[in-house]
Amino acid sequence: DFKTKYKRSVLGVLWSFLNPLLTMMVQYIVFSTLFKSDIPNFSVYLLTGIVCFSFFSEATTMSLTSIVGNASLITKVYVPKYIYPLTRVMSSTINFGLSLIPLLFVLIITRTPIRSAILLLPFGVGCLFALALGVGMLLAAAMVFFRDTQFLWGVVSMLWMYATPIFYPESIIPSNFMVIYKMNPLYHIIRFIRIILIDGISPEPKAYALALLVSFVPLLIGATVFKKTQDRFVLNI
């Protein structure tokens, strides 16, 4: 999937570096005058949110069609069906890993201290991977029985992006909405990663627990739904 994505592209895999940087530049210009005064190290804050959400969006969108898109293979060759969404998420993870390079570049350019806390990054990435896989498996199963899922997910993912503090500070959220706002799994995972990169410290123990909770509960739900419905995939694809 990763090789196919950049097939016949002039810049090829370089787009993994350029996409987050170009997106950050545009959003930085648009939002810096509005939010920069409230957000320390806005460029790192912004790019961290972009890179994390882009991975989640790409991984789940690719997973969505992982079963129906491989209908001919599934009906002819037996392969454990969870492999299909898993490989899509893993492909997006490679792209995500490459996009961390421009993030590191921005950290250096902005002279953000790179401390030992960065070694905790794999924990945050692992939680993000688990969340994407859980949602991806749920979407892949839903797509088999309800083809409008792809269009609904396009709307939901856009709303999810605006409900996640990617380019704005959480301080602008009214206090009476914060309880609902914090039900967003990406809020906790992105916050965890930002504390590591921007503050250079280990997050509080509660942040670890929340990151695990909001990532592995969706994974458990997605895997359970996928397992219970997979025997009917062949009849509906």
What name fits each language-model region?
Residues 1-237:
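Hydrophobic transmembrane alpha-helices and immediately adjacent juxtamembrane helices
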